[in-house]
From Swiss-Prot:
GO terms for cellular component: cytosolic small ribosomal subunit. Protein S19 forms a complex with S13 that binds strongly to the 16S ribosomal RNA. Belongs to the universal ribosomal protein uS19 family. The keyword Cell inner membrane does not apply. Disulfide bonds: none annotated. The modification N-acetylserine is found at residue 2. The lineage of its organism: Archaea, Methanobacteriati, Methanobacteriota, Stenosarchaea group, Halobacteria. Keywords: Acetylation, Ribonucleoprotein, Ribosomal protein, RNA-binding, rRNA-binding. This is Small ribosomal subunit protein uS19. GO terms for molecular function: rRNA binding; structural constituent of ribosome. One of its GO terms (biological process) is translation. The keyword Ribosomal protein applies. The gene is rps19. It comes from the Archaea.
Length: 140
């Protein structure tokens, strides 16, 4: 099974045969041809106005080198494109914003995949009143 991305002998990242520098120089439509079908379709059909604004913010933040300030967004369905690599996004999970630092290995995925909307439930020990049968458990 071949991987979409590889790290070569020199430690250089490549995505479907292209280095990160080559990908960042490509137009969005050229990058879309390398993405998986679902992400490619969303780009080819046209990004929404909100997604274009997010890309503009990412371009400005990349030029200013202000990677410390996260870009806040509710757009969990935005595909990760090469312009976003190295930036920090604050992705909304339904309750609050959580930081996601975009790495090269995230190319072709959605922002929402890296911030889960549900947390795992950790139940405590059963005690008095936890269940109907625990009413008869003697106290220590």
């Amino acid at each position: 099974m071949s991987s979409e991305y590889q790290i070569g002998h020199e430690g250089e990242f490549s995505f479907r045969g292209h280095t990160l520098d080559e990908l960042q120089e490509m137009e969005l439509e050229e990058v879309a041809e390398l993405l998986p079908a679902r992400q490619r379709r969303s780009i080819v059909r046209g990004l929404t106005e909100e997604k274009h604004k997010l890309l503009e913010k990412a371009r400005e933040a990349g030029e200013e080198e202000t990677a410390n300030d996260p870009i806040r967004t509710h757009l969990r369905d935005m595909p990760v494109v090469p312009e976003m690599v190295g930036l920090t996004f604050a992705v909304h999970d339904g309750q609050n914003f959580e930081r996601v630092k975009v790495e090269p290995e995230m190319l072709g995925h959605y922002l929402g995949e890296f911030q889960l909307t549900r947390s795992s439930v950790e139940h405590g020990q059963a005690g008095i009143g936890a269940t109907r049968s625990s009413k008869f458990v003697p106290l220590k």
